[in-house]
């Protein structure tokens, strides 16, 4: 019962903070705003989180994990139906992330450019990442650097998406997407 109550309070604060961060922005949201929306005492906040930025990191990790997992799982489904070369898998994976972030621009208020936070954050994410890396190795990639390569790809995509989707500068996503795909293909070949 006590554990369940603690989980409810934590979830309530995470949900309240997520809503506030995506609507107002992190800098414009105070801890007072969060506890008021979550209907908990301010002291309760500090039992669960060091400060507002600890909360931001946890939400960013959770959200980036969800995006990456969704992309990798969708890629797995697509490959079961229609096997594809690794470079095509990369484009599929990146396309999914781009489309998701274009549909959920407000996530950039939390994620900023840090999409890779969730890459190896959970066992499920690690397993999905390993499946992706197996494809890289199967096509001649170095097993010792497969996870590093995935990290670099996600970092590059996250930073590019932030600039092109959230800021629309120096290029929009439509303008930069072909160059991004060319660069990604060159990196893994």
Q: What are the residue ranges of the model-derived segments?
A:
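Basic, helix-initiating cap at the start of DNA-binding domains
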Residues: 1-24, 28-40, 54
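A short, Lys/Arg-enriched amphipathic alpha-helix from helix-turn-helix/homeodomain DNA-binding modules
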Residues: 10-19, 65, 69-72, 91
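Short hydrophobic/aromatic patch on the recognition helix
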Residues: 39-49
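Alpha-helical DNA-contacting segments of helix-turn-helix folds
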Residues: 56-70, 111, 124
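Hydrophobic alpha-helical connector segments
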Residues: 58, 73-102
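Amphipathic alpha-helical packing segments from all-alpha helical-bundle domains
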Residues: 69, 99-103, 116-151
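Amphipathic alpha-helical segments used for helix-helix packing
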Residues: 92-120, 159-166
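Hydrophobic/aromatic-rich alpha-helical bundle segments in the mid-to-C-terminal region
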Residues: 108-113, 138-183
């Amino acid at each position: 019962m006590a554990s369940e109550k603690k989980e409810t309070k934590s979830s309530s604060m995470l949900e309240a903070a997520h809503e506030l961060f995506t609507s107002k922005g992190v800098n414009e949201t105070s801890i007072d705003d969060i506890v008021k929306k979550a209907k908990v005492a301010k002291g309760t906040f500090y039992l669960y989180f060091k400060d507002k930025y600890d909360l931001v990191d946890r939400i960013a990790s959770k959200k980036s994990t969800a995006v990456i997992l969704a992309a990798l799982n969708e890629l797995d489904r697509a490959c079961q139906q229609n096997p594809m070369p690794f470079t095509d898998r990369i484009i599929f994976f990146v396309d999914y992330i781009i489309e998701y972030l274009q549909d959920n621009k407000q996530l950039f208020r939390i994620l900023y450019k840090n999409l890779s936070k969730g890459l190896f954050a959970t066992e499920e994410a690690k397993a999905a990442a390993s499946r992706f890396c197996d494809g890289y190795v199967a096509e001649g990639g170095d097993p010792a650097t497969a996870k590093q390569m995935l990290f670099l790809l996600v970092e590059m995509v996250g930073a590019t998406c932030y600039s092109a989707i959230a800021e629309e500068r120096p290029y929009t996503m439509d303008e930069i997407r072909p160059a991004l795909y060319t660069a990604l293909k060159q990196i893994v070949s």
